[in-house]
Curated annotation (Swiss-Prot):
Keywords: Phosphoprotein. Residues 177-189, 199-219 have a biased composition (Basic and acidic residues). PANTHER family: SURFEIT LOCUS PROTEIN 2. This is Surfeit locus protein 2. Residues 220-247 have a biased composition (Basic residues). The gene is Surf2. Residues 156-168 have a biased composition (Acidic residues). Belongs to the SURF2 family. The modification Phosphothreonine is found at residue 196. It comes from Mus musculus. InterPro entries: Surf2 (IPR008833).
Length: 257
């Protein structure tokens, strides 16, 4: 890009508050932050204005170092300043610096900074505290009490006993679950071990009856299997005859006619 004319460069050297913006045809005033075209007539008219005359006379010897260490040059933009108390960027002009330092946000942050210095506590800007609190609230809302699932643990001995007691013995007659103690003779005095009068008189008849019942059950089971087999074969034959296609399709059509 071509450089401005020599008369424009000479005029800019006479007014240090006017700075030429790189890669543009514009000039920025550091006192007001105003941008104007890089042409000599516009620059002369701007410098003759009342606002520029007032600011240039009052801020000709403005000391930016007086606001350090809270306001320092910005590392991102060399034409701006950065406030460490409010984490804000400020235009490098006396008017903007004074407006920021006299504002409520800066004064509140400066008061908190001084209190932290007295107590020996590190100062944290308010915006960082707000972000940190918001992050903690989100983590607490994600992990509500009572919703966290614990790790699996093996059951204790009491729980195992309770599970073992949960049998289905109450659904069956108690005679099936009577236990005979070891080491005792068979002819014990317990009432369960004595035979009734009918069992004592006809033990052989009861054995023959149980044998006959087992034989009848076996024969009935065989008959049931044969009957089911016959029904299955008849069903398969009907299914095959229904879904069987004729070999000659033309003959089938003739029969249909």
């Amino acid at each position: 890009m071509d450089e401005p004319p020599s008369d424009v460069l000479a005029f800019l050297r006479q007014h240090p508050s006017l700075r030429l913006l790189p890669n543009t045809r514009k000039v920025r005033c550091s006192l007001t932050g105003h941008e104007l075209p890089c042409r000599l007539p516009e620059l002369q008219e701007y410098t003759r204005g009342k606002k520029y005359q007032r600011l240039s006379s009052s801020f000709s010897n403005f000391d930016y170092a007086a606001f350090e260490p809270h306001i320092v040059p910005s590392t991102k933009n060399r034409h701006q300043l950065f406030c460490k108390l409010t984490l804000r960027h400020i235009n490098k002009s006396p008017e903007h610096v004074l407006r920021h330092t006299q504002g409520r946000r800066y004064q509140r942050a400066l008061h908190q900074y001084e209190e932290c210095q007295k107590q020996g506590v590190e100062y944290v800007p308010a915006c960082l505290l707000h972000k940190r609190k918001k992050r903690e609230d989100q983590t607490n809302s994600d992990e509500l009490p009572g919703q966290r699932t614990g790790f699996w643990e093996p059951a204790s001995s009491d729980e195992e006993d309770a599970l073992s007691d949960d049998s289905m013995t109450d659904l069956y007659p108690p005679e099936l679950f009577t236990k005979r103690e070891l080491g005792k003779p068979k002819n014990d005095d317990t009432p369960e071990d004595f035979l009734t009068d009918q069992q004592d008189e006809k033990p052989e008849h009861s054995e023959e009856k149980s044998f006959r019942e087992r034989e009848e059950a076996r024969v009935g089971h065989k008959r049931g299997r044969k009957l089911r087999k016959k029904q299955l074969t008849s069903l398969t034959k009907k299914f095959k005859s229904y879904h069987h296609k004729p070999k000659n399709f033309s003959s089938f059509k003739q029969l249909g006619r």
